[in-house]
């Protein structure tokens, strides 16, 4: 954290010009994730522990340009007067202050050991950088919250910054909760599952992991190594025969007694030991068992131990760097380039590397890397448990204060270090290399996206470069499970946290009425935008205030007829500022032969290799991918609820034969056409009917 002008009188004049950064670590209770995930293609359909869940791609924030000219004297004088008024009533004790503009929007949240001195530094007529001057000029009032200690002020400050997202603070973005691996403790045969959110369920938690993908890969490998179950308790209790995971050697089958209680408990102990960092001991035990089985000529058993050892080696090879001297630490490295910042975070627990992730905090380019890193750390640990050590690439000010706040929050000692030698220094250097490369890739992608958007402006004769593009599509099978979807793109690429799906509700829509479905989706979307926000929501910050809510360009899948139908909807809603375009597939649905339709214009045909056409295809294909995925989730839900009841020509005897042969509905769904034909009593025609039911081609 930076030294503020009121803290040290000797450097008051110089420090007053320094940008004040917002920091803190808050003790807010972590909330369970509300992410909608599709159950993994596993035997137990309700098991979401290995769900194929997309991690949102982080995007570069929009960095406001620093004004080149001085701020007008009039607004500055008014702002200083408002701050001076607050100084008269401000306490000399620790606290948090909020600067507000004329609309009562919070411009800045800061904390101070002496609030009166800190505010007085803003009331001085000179010595401020342009960014601070602009903030002062916009200020009309100041709110103050007194705290008992400076540490408490630090915690409160970070919490308020995350809640209010003030314009002049450094803001942490893409702050989703991290996934953990949970070995449950409320059943005699524990599960191994993915977990996100509050750690309220009994059991052992291991993490955090940097991404859902790394957790899923690790759990799959752990199942091969330790044969632990991932199914729900309800599925476990309903089994009368082992499921497919037992057959493919990813579960020991405790549900049907294929392994006894002591044997399964030993597997759980081995898995717990491995995740706790005792991997060498576990591998030695497995190697010993393999040699013993081989010596006794039990080659099948020896092969099982060999496969389990290979699975453990696969996990460790995925982890890459596994330090010798660092047991539990988070490593942070920051890099600045082109006016943007990237913070790379590595997680090390029990001496193992559990992944890394890049963040792109929003901060004006006049901030130093030390200021951004300090603000980032405070907000990062606002709702996350800190490890015993935090290793940094750059020394931050008020390091001891942040460490004290994290100690209070976590209940254990927390060290914040900037290592200068040894293995810790190497880990920080590796993280710094990753930060540099991640920011370089992101800047290159953003530059490419900018060129494509400029090409779109030229080709479509748009009035300005679009900041928000919305693409719509719908999917159904003969009108059933109808769903519409909207994807969003902007200067930084796809904005996945803005994607939305719309379950079609209208009863009057006939099967296959694509126009009617699109009408419902667009009416619901734009009526919501046109409606005034509820009073309770009016003053709240948007989830991502850098993404405009109104689109500059709307793209739909279809031809002139679809375009005309959407035009009617827009006219009825009074929309005239949104540009509309329809993309019609070429003959035989060939990519590269699309035709673009826009209101009051002739059809547009682009060359197959035109980068703008490729960009439009990407937008359309992403909408199609998202809507098909949403449709499949709905259909899978219906299939689970209806079972085999809806398949025409499949009576009770054939249903019994199918369930007896495959064991579960999920295995029937996964079966190939040839596998279905092998079931006694199932003809080739019936097998095709069953296969087509589970594998339809959506419209």
UniProtKB/Swiss-Prot annotation:
Q: What residue spans carry the region label Disordered? A: 1-59
UniProt entry keywords in alphabetical sequence:
Cytoplasm, DNA damage, DNA excision, DNA repair, Excision nuclease, SOS response
Any one cellular-component term (Gene Ontology): cytoplasm
Q: Name one GO biological process term.
A: nucleotide-excision repair
Q: Which residues form a coiled coil?
A: none
Biased composition of type Low complexity is found at 1-51
* Alphabetical list of InterPro entries matching this protein: GIY-YIG_endonuc, GIY-YIG_endonuc_sf, GIY-YIG_UvrC_Cho, Hlx-hairpin-Hlx_DNA-bd_motif, RuvA_2-like, UVR_dom, UVR_dom_sf, UvrABC_protein_C
The cellular location(s) given in this protein's UniProt record come to: Cytoplasm
Residue ranges of the GIY-YIG domain?
92-170
- Cited function: The UvrABC repair system catalyzes the recognition and processing of DNA lesions. UvrC both incises the 5' and 3' sides of the lesion. The N-terminal half is responsible for the 3' incision and the C-terminal half is responsible for the 5' incision.
Q: How does it assemble?
A: Interacts with UvrB in an incision complex.
The record ties this protein, via HAMAP family, to: UvrC
What is the name attached to this protein's record? Answer: UvrABC system protein C
Q: List the lineage, top down.
A: Bacteria, Pseudomonadati, Pseudomonadota, Alphaproteobacteria, Hyphomicrobiales
Q: Which gene produces this protein? A: uvrC
């Amino acid at each position: 954290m930076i030294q503020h002008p009121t803290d040290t009188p000797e450097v008051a004049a110089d420090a007053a010009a320094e940008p004040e950064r917002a920091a803190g670590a808050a003790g807010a209770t972590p909330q369970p994730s509300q992410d909608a995930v599709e159950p993994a293609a596993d035997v137990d359909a309700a098991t979401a522990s290995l769900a194929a869940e997309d991690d949102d791609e982080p995007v570069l924030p929009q960095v406001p340009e620093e004004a080149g000219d001085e701020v007008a004297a009039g607004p500055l004088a008014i702002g200083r007067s408002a701050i001076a008024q607050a100084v008269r009533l401000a306490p000399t004790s620790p606290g948090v202050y909020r600067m507000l503009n004329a609309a009562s929007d919070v411009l800045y949240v800061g904390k101070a050991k002496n609030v009166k001195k800190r505010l007085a530094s803003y009331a001085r007529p000179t010595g401020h950088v342009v960014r601070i001057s602009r903030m002062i000029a916009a200020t009309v009032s100041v709110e103050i919250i007194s705290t008992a200690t400076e540490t408490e002020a630090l915690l409160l400050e970070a919490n308020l910054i995350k809640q209010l997202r003030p314009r002049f603070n450094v803001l942490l973005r893409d702050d989703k909760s991290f996934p953990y691996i949970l070995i449950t403790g409320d059943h005699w045969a524990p599960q191994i599952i993915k977990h996100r959110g509050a750690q309220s369920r009994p059991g052992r938690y291991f993490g955090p992991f940097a991404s859902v993908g790394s957790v899923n890969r690790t759990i799959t490998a752990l199942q091969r190594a330790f044969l632990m179950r991932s199914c729900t308790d309800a599925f476990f209790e309903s089994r009368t025969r082992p499921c497919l995971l037992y057959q493919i050697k990813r579960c020991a089958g405790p549900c049907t007694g294929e392994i006894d209680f002591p044997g399964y408990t030993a597997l759980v102990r081995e898995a717990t030991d491995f995740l706790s960092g005792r991997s060498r001991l576990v591998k030695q035990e497995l190697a010993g068992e393999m040699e013993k089985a081989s010596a006794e000529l039990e080659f099948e058993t020896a092969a099982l131990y060999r496969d389990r050892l290979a699975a453990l080696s696969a996990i460790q090879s995925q982890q890459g760097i596994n330090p010798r001297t660092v047991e539990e630490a988070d490593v942070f490295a920051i890099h600045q380039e082109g006016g943007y910042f990237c913070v790379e975070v590595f997680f090390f627990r029990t001496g193992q590397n559990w992944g890394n992730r890049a963040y792109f905090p929003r901060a004006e380019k006049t901030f130093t890397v030390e200021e951004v890193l300090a603000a980032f750390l405070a907000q990062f640990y606002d709702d996350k448990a800190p490890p015993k050590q935090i290793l940094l690439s750059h020394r931050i000010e008020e390091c001891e204060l942040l460490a004290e706040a994290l100690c209070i929050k976590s209940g254990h000692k927390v060290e914040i270090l900037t290592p200068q030698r040894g293995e810790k220094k190497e880990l920080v250097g590796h993280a710094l290399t990753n930060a540099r490369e991640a920011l370089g890739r992101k800047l290159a992608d953003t530059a490419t996206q900018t060129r494509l958007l400029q090409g779109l402006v030229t080709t479509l004769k748009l009035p300005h470069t679009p900041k928000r593009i919305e693409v719509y599509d719908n999917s159904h099978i003969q009108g059933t499970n109808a769903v519409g979807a909207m994807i969003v793109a902007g200067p930084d690429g796809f904005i996945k946290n803005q994607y939305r799906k719309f379950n079609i509700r209208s009863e009057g829509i006939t099967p296959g009425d694509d126009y009617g479905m699109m009408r419902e989706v667009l009416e619901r979307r734009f009526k919501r935008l046109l409606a005034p926000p509820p009073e309770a929501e009016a003053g709240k910050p948007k989830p991502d205030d850098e993404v405009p809510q109104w689109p500059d360009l709307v793209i739909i899948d279809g031809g002139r007829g679809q375009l005309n139908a959407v035009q009617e909807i827009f006219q009825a809603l009074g929309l005239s500022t949104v540009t509309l375009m329809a993309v019609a597939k070429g003959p035989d649905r060939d990519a590269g032969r699309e035709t673009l339709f826009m209101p009051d214009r002739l059809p547009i045909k682009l060359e197959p290799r035109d980068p703008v056409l490729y960009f439009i295809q990407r937008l359309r294909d992403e909408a199609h991918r998202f809507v098909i995925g949403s449709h499949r989730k709905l259909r899978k839900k219906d299939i689970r609820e209806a079972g085999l009841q809806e398949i025409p020509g499949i009576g009770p005897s054939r249903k019994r034969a199918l369930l007896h042969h495959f064991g579960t509905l999920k295995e029937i769904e996964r079966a190939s056409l040839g596998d279905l034909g092998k079931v006694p009593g199932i003809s080739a025609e019936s097998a095709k009917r069953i296969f087509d039911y589970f594998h339809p081609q959506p419209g």
